[in-house]
A protein has these predicted regions:
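PLP-dependent amino-acid enzyme catalytic core
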Residues: 1-231
Length: 231
């Protein structure tokens, strides 16, 4: 209710990095973390831009778009990675792990985001991205190695890479960073909270379209709105 609206609104001007970005909604995402575990790279709080008259005419309806391309690695995946890697940092500190391998299958965005956030955790994380050979754009291919990740290109498609990642996660101390990781979904719930806050906590009458991919993102957004309904 009003308590939560006031709390989240009050954080709009905070200078504490740990409670900026997606962690403005800390209590809804990851209340087990200490502030020292939270990784903030400027993700989240992206603007909602009204479409131009030309775009509205082409689509046939008035609409606006949330520009998540302004996130650090240029995609909405950064929301989930901020949460997932903050959790990993917390786990490593709590259990004093000296080495954890992070791995993901990707056609571009996921590997870029995972490598970037892993680089800010540093040791004990090692990072590997599995990409389908020839299926990643030239613009996205340099992003993971640019953040220090090892990139392995495998024959086949994304699903073939994902099978390898799942096998590794099931049999070794490996952190899977695809959307099967529930901490990824929690971080991406922030999309829903930001939309609601942007519109003064009243989203009645709005229809929201989101990138779907393998449905992890739409699951996160729906979960976020359902949580808000309960509050």
């Amino acid at each position: 209710g009003q308590y939560w609206r006031d709390l989240f609104d009050s954080r709009a001007s905070t200078r504490r990095n740990a409670l900026r970005g997606v962690f403005r909604y800390y209590e809804l995402l990851a209340p087990i973390f200490d502030e020292e575990d939270i990784i903030y790279l400027g993700e989240g709080l992206t603007p909602i831009i009204e479409a131009s008259d030309f775009m509205k005419e082409k689509v046939g309806i008035p609409f606006a778009f949330k520009n998540d391309g302004q996130n650090p690695s240029a995609s909405f995946k950064d929301r989930g990675m901020a949460c997932a890697f903050s959790y990993l940092k917390w786990l490593c500190r709590r259990h004093q792990w000296d080495e954890v391998l992070t791995v993901c299958a990707s056609t571009g965005d996921t590997s870029a985001a995972a490598a970037l956030y892993a680089s800010y955790v540093g040791a004990p994380l090692k990072r590997v991205a599995l990409l389908p050979h020839g299926k990643v754009t030239p613009q996205q291919l340099p992003q993971p190695p640019g953040s220090g990740a090892t990139v392995l290109e495998l024959p086949g498609v994304f699903d073939d890479c994902m099978k390898v990642v799942e096998h590794l996660a099931e049999n070794y101390r490996v952190a899977l960073l695809n959307s099967k990781n529930s901490w990824r979904i929690l971080g991406q719930e922030s999309y829903a909270y930001e939309v609601a806050q942007w519109y003064g906590w009243d989203v009645s009458g709005l229809c929201i379209f989101v990138p779907i991919g393998n449905a992890g993102n739409i699951t996160a957004v729906m979960s976020g709105f359902l949580k808000m309904l309960e509050l």
